Protein backbone atom coordinates (compact mmCIF):
# COMPACT_ATOMS: atom_id res chain seq x y z
CA UNK A 1 0.00 0.00 0.00
CA UNK A 2 2.85 2.39 0.78
CA UNK A 3 4.76 1.94 -2.48
CA UNK A 4 3.79 2.44 -6.11
CA UNK A 5 6.53 0.74 -8.09
CA UNK A 6 7.61 -2.42 -6.27
CA UNK A 7 8.10 -5.61 -8.23
CA UNK A 8 10.17 -8.76 -8.51
CA UNK A 9 12.76 -9.38 -11.22
CA UNK A 10 12.48 -13.16 -11.35
CA UNK A 11 11.29 -15.36 -14.20
CA UNK A 12 12.92 -13.62 -17.16
CA UNK A 13 14.46 -15.95 -19.74
CA UNK A 14 18.15 -15.53 -20.51
CA UNK A 15 19.93 -15.92 -23.83
CA UNK A 16 21.33 -19.31 -22.78
CA UNK A 17 17.89 -20.77 -22.05
CA UNK A 18 17.86 -20.36 -18.28
CA UNK A 19 15.58 -18.15 -16.20
CA UNK A 20 16.29 -15.51 -13.58
CA UNK A 21 15.58 -17.10 -10.22
CA UNK A 22 12.44 -16.08 -8.36
CA UNK A 23 12.59 -14.64 -4.86
CA UNK A 24 16.06 -13.14 -5.16
CA UNK A 25 15.80 -9.58 -6.45
CA UNK A 26 13.21 -6.83 -6.03
CA UNK A 27 13.09 -3.22 -7.23
CA UNK A 28 11.03 -0.49 -5.62
CA UNK A 29 10.36 3.15 -4.93
CA UNK A 30 11.02 4.62 -1.47
CA UNK A 31 10.01 2.65 1.63
CA UNK A 32 9.19 5.65 3.81
CA UNK A 33 5.42 5.19 3.63
CA UNK A 34 5.10 1.44 4.06
CA UNK A 35 2.59 0.21 6.62
CA UNK A 36 3.17 -2.41 9.29
CA UNK A 37 1.45 -4.92 7.02
CA UNK A 38 3.79 -3.91 4.19
CA UNK A 39 6.81 -4.47 6.41
CA UNK A 40 5.53 -7.89 7.42
CA UNK A 41 5.04 -8.76 3.77
CA UNK A 42 8.59 -7.69 2.91
CA UNK A 43 9.86 -9.87 5.76
CA UNK A 44 7.84 -12.80 4.46
CA UNK A 45 9.65 -12.54 1.13
CA UNK A 46 12.92 -13.34 2.87
CA UNK A 47 14.57 -10.08 1.86
CA UNK A 48 17.87 -9.64 3.72
CA UNK A 49 19.32 -6.48 2.14
CA UNK A 50 17.75 -3.12 1.32
CA UNK A 51 19.92 -1.02 -1.00
CA UNK A 52 19.06 2.69 -1.09
CA UNK A 53 20.25 4.86 -3.99
CA UNK A 54 18.80 8.11 -2.61
CA UNK A 55 20.81 11.16 -1.61
CA UNK A 56 21.35 12.20 2.00
CA UNK A 57 18.68 14.89 1.76
CA UNK A 58 16.14 12.48 0.32
CA UNK A 59 16.81 9.96 3.08
CA UNK A 60 16.55 12.64 5.77
CA UNK A 61 13.20 13.84 4.46
CA UNK A 62 11.75 10.36 3.96
CA UNK A 63 13.67 7.73 5.94
CA UNK A 64 13.01 4.11 5.04
CA UNK A 65 10.87 2.01 7.36
CA UNK A 66 12.77 -1.25 7.25
CA UNK A 67 11.74 -4.42 9.10
CA UNK A 68 14.09 -5.77 11.75
CA UNK A 69 16.68 -8.18 10.48
CA UNK A 70 17.30 -6.49 7.16
CA UNK A 71 20.68 -4.96 6.36
CA UNK A 72 20.47 -1.36 5.14
CA UNK A 73 23.05 -0.51 2.46
CA UNK A 74 23.47 3.08 1.26
CA UNK A 75 24.79 3.76 -2.25
CA UNK A 76 23.82 7.42 -2.74
CA UNK A 77 23.33 8.96 -6.16
CA UNK A 78 22.38 12.60 -6.51
CA UNK A 79 19.66 12.88 -9.13
CA UNK A 80 17.79 15.58 -11.01
CA UNK A 81 19.46 18.43 -9.14
CA UNK A 82 20.28 20.37 -12.30
CA UNK A 83 16.76 20.16 -13.68
CA UNK A 84 14.80 20.63 -10.43
CA UNK A 85 14.43 24.44 -10.76
CA UNK A 86 12.94 24.03 -14.25
CA UNK A 87 10.58 21.30 -13.03
CA UNK A 88 9.37 23.48 -10.18
CA UNK A 89 8.83 26.40 -12.55
CA UNK A 90 6.81 24.19 -14.86
CA UNK A 91 4.70 22.98 -11.94
CA UNK A 92 3.80 26.61 -11.29
CA UNK A 93 3.03 27.15 -14.95
CA UNK A 94 5.94 29.57 -15.32
CA UNK A 95 8.05 27.66 -17.83
CA UNK A 96 7.81 25.22 -20.72
CA UNK A 97 10.15 22.79 -22.42
CA UNK A 98 10.99 19.16 -23.10
CA UNK A 99 11.51 17.68 -19.66
CA UNK A 100 12.09 14.31 -21.23
CA UNK A 101 15.22 15.58 -22.96
CA UNK A 102 16.41 17.13 -19.72
CA UNK A 103 15.93 13.80 -17.98
CA UNK A 104 17.97 12.07 -20.67
CA UNK A 105 20.81 14.45 -19.86
CA UNK A 106 20.40 13.97 -16.10
CA UNK A 107 20.33 10.18 -16.41
CA UNK A 108 23.53 10.25 -18.46
CA UNK A 109 25.34 10.92 -15.18
CA UNK A 110 24.58 7.34 -14.14
CA UNK A 111 27.28 6.35 -16.63
CA UNK A 112 29.57 9.38 -16.57
CA UNK A 113 29.58 10.16 -12.85
CA UNK A 114 28.22 7.20 -10.88
CA UNK A 115 29.65 4.20 -12.67
CA UNK A 116 31.59 3.25 -9.54
CA UNK A 117 28.41 3.24 -7.47
CA UNK A 118 26.68 0.87 -9.87
CA UNK A 119 29.75 -1.36 -9.95
CA UNK A 120 29.61 -1.48 -6.14
CA UNK A 121 25.93 -2.36 -6.41
CA UNK A 122 26.57 -5.34 -8.69
CA UNK A 123 29.46 -6.49 -6.51
CA UNK A 124 27.23 -6.27 -3.43
CA UNK A 125 24.63 -8.49 -5.08
CA UNK A 126 27.29 -10.98 -6.15
CA UNK A 127 29.02 -11.08 -2.76
CA UNK A 128 25.92 -11.20 -0.58
CA UNK A 129 24.08 -13.93 -2.47
CA UNK A 130 20.95 -13.08 -0.47
CA UNK A 131 17.47 -11.83 -1.47
CA UNK A 132 17.77 -8.07 -1.90
CA UNK A 133 15.54 -5.08 -2.59
CA UNK A 134 16.95 -1.93 -4.15
CA UNK A 135 15.24 1.40 -4.59
CA UNK A 136 15.48 5.13 -5.13
CA UNK A 137 12.66 7.65 -4.64
CA UNK A 138 10.29 6.86 -7.50
CA UNK A 139 11.87 3.53 -8.36
CA UNK A 140 12.21 4.43 -12.01
CA UNK A 141 15.49 6.20 -12.90
CA UNK A 142 18.32 5.22 -10.54
CA UNK A 143 16.64 1.92 -9.63
CA UNK A 144 15.53 1.42 -13.23
CA UNK A 145 19.10 1.61 -14.50
CA UNK A 146 20.24 -0.70 -11.69
CA UNK A 147 17.62 -3.26 -12.71
CA UNK A 148 18.64 -2.97 -16.36
CA UNK A 149 22.37 -3.57 -15.86
CA UNK A 150 21.63 -6.41 -13.43
CA UNK A 151 19.39 -8.20 -15.91
CA UNK A 152 21.92 -7.66 -18.69
CA UNK A 153 24.68 -9.03 -16.46
CA UNK A 154 22.85 -12.35 -16.04
CA UNK A 155 22.09 -12.66 -19.74
CA UNK A 156 18.58 -11.29 -20.14
CA UNK A 157 18.08 -9.99 -23.72
CA UNK A 158 18.09 -6.24 -24.28
CA UNK A 159 14.48 -6.19 -25.51
CA UNK A 160 13.28 -7.87 -22.31
CA UNK A 161 15.34 -5.47 -20.20
CA UNK A 162 13.75 -2.47 -21.90
CA UNK A 163 10.27 -3.97 -21.49
CA UNK A 164 10.87 -4.37 -17.76
CA UNK A 165 12.03 -0.77 -17.56
CA UNK A 166 8.84 0.41 -19.27
CA UNK A 167 6.60 -1.47 -16.80
CA UNK A 168 7.03 1.47 -14.44
CA UNK A 169 4.37 3.33 -16.43
CA UNK A 170 1.86 0.54 -15.76
CA UNK A 171 2.63 0.27 -12.07
CA UNK A 172 2.53 4.01 -11.39
CA UNK A 173 -0.26 5.15 -13.74
CA UNK A 174 -2.92 5.68 -11.07
CA UNK A 175 -0.51 7.46 -8.73
CA UNK A 176 0.86 9.71 -11.50
CA UNK A 177 -2.59 10.61 -12.82
CA UNK A 178 -3.74 11.63 -9.34
CA UNK A 179 -0.54 13.58 -8.67
CA UNK A 180 -0.78 15.53 -11.92
CA UNK A 181 -4.41 16.40 -11.21
CA UNK A 182 -3.30 17.92 -7.92
CA UNK A 183 -0.57 19.93 -9.64
CA UNK A 184 -3.13 21.23 -12.14
CA UNK A 185 -5.41 22.24 -9.29
CA UNK A 186 -2.72 23.84 -7.12
CA UNK A 187 -1.39 25.85 -10.08
CA UNK A 188 -4.90 27.17 -10.79
CA UNK A 189 -4.83 25.34 -14.13
CA UNK A 190 -1.63 27.11 -15.19
CA UNK A 191 0.65 24.05 -15.18
CA UNK A 192 0.85 22.06 -18.41
CA UNK A 193 0.68 18.57 -16.95
CA UNK A 194 1.33 16.98 -20.34
CA UNK A 195 4.74 18.68 -20.29
CA UNK A 196 5.36 17.33 -16.79
CA UNK A 197 4.27 13.76 -17.43
CA UNK A 198 7.62 12.54 -18.86
CA UNK A 199 9.45 13.19 -15.61
CA UNK A 200 6.80 11.24 -13.69
CA UNK A 201 7.27 8.11 -15.77
CA UNK A 202 9.74 6.52 -18.15
CA UNK A 203 10.35 6.52 -21.90
CA UNK A 204 12.45 4.14 -23.94
CA UNK A 205 14.86 6.92 -24.85
CA UNK A 206 15.75 7.36 -21.17
CA UNK A 207 17.24 3.88 -20.92
CA UNK A 208 18.33 3.25 -24.51
CA UNK A 209 20.70 6.20 -24.43
CA UNK A 210 22.45 4.53 -21.48
CA UNK A 211 22.39 0.86 -22.41
CA UNK A 212 23.62 1.33 -25.94
CA UNK A 213 26.70 3.27 -24.92
CA UNK A 214 29.90 1.25 -24.78
CA UNK A 215 30.42 2.29 -21.16
CA UNK A 216 27.08 0.95 -19.97
CA UNK A 217 27.17 -2.33 -21.83
CA UNK A 218 30.79 -3.36 -21.44
CA UNK A 219 32.25 -6.10 -19.26
CA UNK A 220 32.98 -3.71 -16.41
CA UNK A 221 29.23 -3.57 -15.78
CA UNK A 222 28.44 -7.13 -16.71
CA UNK A 223 30.84 -8.43 -14.05
Regions found by a protein language model. Give the residues of each.
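Catalytic-loop region of hydrolases
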Residues: 1-22, 33-49
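Short, cationic motifs built from Arg/Lys/His that form the positively charged side of catalytic pockets
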Residues: 7, 24-27, 54, 142, ...
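Conserved beta-strand segments of alpha/beta enzyme cores
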Residues: 24, 71-73, 160
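Cysteine-based protein phosphatase catalytic domain of the PTP/DSP
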Residues: 28-126
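Cysteine-dependent PTP/DSP-like catalytic domain, specifically the C-terminal lobe
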Residues: 116-134, 144-211
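Substrate/cofactor-recognition hotspot
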Residues: 139
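Single conserved hydrophobic/aromatic residue that forms the stacking wall/gate
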Residues: 212-223
